[in-house]
Amino acid sequence: MRIPDRELIEQVIEAGRYAPSGGNSQTTHFIVITDAGILSELESLVQAEFAKMETVPGMYPSLRNSVEASKRGNYSFHYRAPVLIVTANQKGYGNALVDSACALENMMVAANALDLGSCWINQLHWLDEDAEVRAFMEKLGVGENETITGGLILGYSADGLPARTPLKRTGNPVTWI
């Protein structure tokens, strides 16, 4: 698996750093993981922690899928991509998720412009209060006063970026006044 050049990764991160933030707070923290051993260790930990969970009626479908795949023992939350960028932000900050979402979207747009594949990854956010995952992420630089807000994987698509037909939007209603 080919890791994108560091310069390309830095360009993607820089796009995230220039995303809007509430009151121009600029508090989104980016943790960039390219070490294959760390990614493998984190993958095993995430699978083990999801496997401990029970599914419940009404559970968010992606979370349910994560739990079920983990119980089967074949779950890679980061799809074995060579780069994982985790975002974190201050606990108690009212715009933590929104600011990080803006940064993640900017990074996805930049990745596309650089012919890199990307995918939004929420699993570490879902496991932010899991003691094992939390301890591991703190060793990687997430602060005790921070909450994990999201993530993004980067890499090269096996067959290049796919040509996509725009999907018809049926949700996200618009109300005009």
Where are these regions (language model features)?
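C-terminal helix-cap and adjacent tail motif
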Residues: 71-72, 142-177
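Short, surface-exposed beta-edge/turn micro-motifs
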Residues: 27-28, 81-84, 148-149
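Short, hinge-like loop/turn segments at secondary-structure boundaries
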Residues: 48-49, 137-139
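N-terminal amphipathic, basic helical "cap/leader" segment at the start of enzyme domains
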Residues: 1-78, 176-177
